[in-house]
């Protein structure tokens, strides 16, 4: 009987948590239900969204569950064919790098045991049960923003999205307006792939002409000539910090605007809600 009671309580807790992150329970009811289930409401918890890429394996749920043996405090929930949510209770001593290490363990386990590639979004820490839904949405946003700006990363932390998070919330019309203002002389498409590669390397090397020319295996004067050419085409001198910032942001906005034809934007809690954006 005791084993059955524990199983039922665990099952009910998992269902309760799933209802919270899915917004299927009223905020006022969270307190009542938590009390009924003897659920501690105000401990810190991290929220991970594990998305299987290329192919999904139903065994992924069990593989991840095995990493979290404390079934009363940690919850591993299947929310779709490809998505699994992990909600882990934290101690006060855990640092940001410890939270990322958990995601790395999940990624490694799924890859080594099932040969399945994943991308993992991490929301900010929830300090109360009622915050779980927002933290789950943050993990979703982390993955969506990562798909645009951090394609090489498999673990994306919402806290580290930086300017990408701001750009992600811009409406299409504002993106287009900004790009037309920045590139008054010529559109960004006027820059060929080699020129764009030069620009990216210049940014990677902190606008250092000597270091960039070394990385590109070109003479310093050749790089200066290219930068002058960019200035002539765009009106922006990338050697000037303010111009470089404007250009960098414009490149990110352009990348984001291009992605709007095929990505689904989800609610961020404060941003706009779920809508599939299609451009003609």
Residue positions per predicted region:
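Cytosolic nucleotide-utilizing catalytic cores of signal-transduction proteins
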Residues: 13, 24-47, 51-280
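Short, charged amphipathic alpha-helical surface segments
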Residues: 1-19
């Amino acid at each position: 009987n005791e084993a059955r009671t524990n199983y039922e309580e665990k099952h009910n807790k998992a269902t309760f948590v799933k209802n919270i992150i899915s917004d299927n329970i009223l905020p006022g009811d969270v307190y009542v239900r938590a009390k009924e289930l003897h659920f501690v409401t105000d401990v810190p918890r991290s929220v991970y969204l594990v998305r299987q890429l290329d192919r999904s394996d139903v065994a992924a749920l069990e593989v991840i569950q095995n990493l979290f043996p404390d079934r009363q405090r940690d919850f591993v929930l299947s929310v779709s064919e490809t998505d699994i949510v992990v909600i882990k209770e934290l101690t006060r001593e855990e640092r940001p790098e410890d939270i990322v290490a958990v995601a790395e363990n999940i990624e490694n386990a799924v890859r080594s045991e099932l040969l399945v590639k994943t991308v993992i979004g991490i929301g900010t820490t929830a300090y109360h049960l009622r915050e779980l839904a927002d933290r789950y949405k943050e993990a979703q946003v982390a993955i969506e923003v990562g798909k645009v700006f951090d394609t090489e990363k498999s673990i994306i932390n919402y806290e580290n999205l930086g300017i990408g998070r701001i750009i992600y919330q811009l409406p299409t019309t504002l993106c287009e307006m900004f790009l037309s203002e920045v590139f008054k002389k010529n559109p960004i498409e006027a820059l060929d792939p080699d020129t764009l590669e030069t620009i990216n390397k210049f940014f990677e090397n902190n606008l250092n002409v000597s270091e960039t020319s070394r990385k590109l295996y070109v003479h310093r004067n050749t790089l200066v000539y290219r930068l002058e050419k960019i200035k002539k085409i765009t009106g922006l001198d990338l050697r000037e910090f303010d111009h470089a910032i404007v250009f960098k942001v414009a490149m990110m906005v352009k990348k984001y605007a291009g992605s709007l034809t095929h990505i689904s934007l989800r609610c961020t809690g404060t941003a706009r809600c779920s809508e599939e954006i299609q451009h003609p």
